[in-house]
Amino acid sequence: MCKEGNTIATLVDIVRPVVAPVIPKPFELVDIEYEKLGGNYVLSILVDKPEGITVEDTADLTDIISPLLDTIKPDPFPEQYMLEISSPGLERPLKTAQSLMNAVGHYINVSLYQAIDKVKVFEGDLTAFDGETLKMTYLDKTQQKTVTIPYKMVAKARLAVKL
């Protein structure tokens, strides 16, 4: 828990409107995470751009974002934290409808709130997304199958690495 009963989700909700407007083009704010790793709290701001981000990019973004976080009143952070600006990596989260639209044609992993045909996690190629339903092809043992998933049933989605 954070100060004054704020949850981690609330902390992220407080930080997002401060950070999002200052992320310059061509960068995209992918996600903000706040978690305790070992004995330290870490605020991770995941950014990307079409050609990928560099160490210099993360340093420049840190110089922009860090002073702004210190201006949030009242201070939403329960303790000292480390600020981490990084790439979302190969298995970047797909948290918005737009990120799913951009992922059409890519190999993804989708976790559901409720099972479809006794399956709660699908991994395969996202063949279509219309804003309301995802269409995926996946391998069930040795058989290629297709599944249609209502967007509202998606608990979590991310790009996946095909092995």
UniProtKB/Swiss-Prot annotation:
GO biological process: ribosomal small subunit assembly; translation
Keywords, ordered alphabetically: Cytoplasm, Ribosome biogenesis
The keyword Cytoplasm appears for this protein: yes
Cellular component GO terms held in the UniProt record: cytosol
Top-level taxon in the UniProt lineage: Bacteria
UniProt-annotated location(s): Cytoplasm
One Pfam family it belongs to: RimP_N
Its biological purpose: Required for maturation of 30S ribosomal subunits.
Alphabetized PANTHER family for the sequence: RIBOSOME MATURATION FACTOR RIMP
Family note: Belongs to the RimP family.
Protein known as: Ribosome maturation factor RimP
